[in-house]
């Protein structure tokens, strides 16, 4: 049977043109930050994205911070959340972004330590070289940073070498959720906004006859 081009494929393909615009940043404490341009609605995409980044960056999961990105017009359809498509369409782009970040850190380490790039290894957020020399990702973050967007080649980790992706992990937002610290849409406070209720007609194809701004009594 030939493969069918379905809604899942359509969503994935519509996100591809802007997938190269997502990026990962590293701070001086060695924490990787990523703002995912999709909606976390309980399906666990922030945890999944953090696991992918930690895997590709050779970084402990505890040192990855995934937040929800604000609306970015330039991302167009890369902000669509639906059809169980987020991880299908973002798995590789997130891996690529993490691999690019790792490559930049390795290049910075090679320059700072004065050793060949091929002589360096990464593990748990530390780059090590010959003779025991090493630098943490945090120490190299500023030197590895780039303010420009350019095409680069990247080699992804072989899936057979995965140690985190595919393993059971606690949700990164679980503690905040059960202790009342997690913010939901209902927690949003908009200055000057008034309570609103959606009114639906009791019949099919019903329509309102009028409206009033006068306060209701009773």
Task: Describe every region a protein language model picked out.
Residues 1-218:
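Cofactor-binding beta-sheet edge motifs in enzyme active sites
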């Amino acid at each position: 049977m030939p493969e069918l081009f379905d809604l899942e494929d359509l969503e994935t393909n519509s996100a591809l043109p802007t997938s190269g615009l997502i990026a990962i940043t590293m701070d001086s404490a060695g924490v990787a930050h990523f703002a995912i341009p999709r909606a976390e609605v309980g399906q666990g995409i922030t945890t999944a994205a953090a696991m992918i980044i930690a895997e590709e960056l050779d970084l402990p999961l505890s040192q990855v911070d995934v937040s929800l990105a604000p609306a970015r017009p330039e991302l167009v359809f890369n902000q669509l959340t639906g059809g169980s498509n987020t991880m299908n369409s973002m798995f590789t782009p997130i891996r690529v972004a993490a691999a690019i970040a790792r490559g930049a850190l390795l290049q910075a380490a090679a320059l700072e330590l004065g050793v060949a790039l091929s002589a360096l290894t990464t593990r748990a957020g530390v780059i090590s070289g010959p003779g025991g020399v090493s630098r943490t990702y945090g120490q190299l973050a500023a030197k590895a940073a780039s303010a420009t967007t350019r095409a680069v080649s990247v080699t992804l980790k072989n899936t057979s070498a995965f140690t985190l992706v595919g393993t059971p992990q606690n949700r990164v937002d679980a503690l905040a959720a059960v202790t009342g610290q997690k913010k939901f849409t209902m927690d949003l406070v908009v200055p000057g906004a008034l309570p609103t209720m959606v009114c639906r007609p009791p019949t099919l194809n019903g329509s309102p006859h009028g409206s009033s701004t006068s306060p209701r009594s009773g």
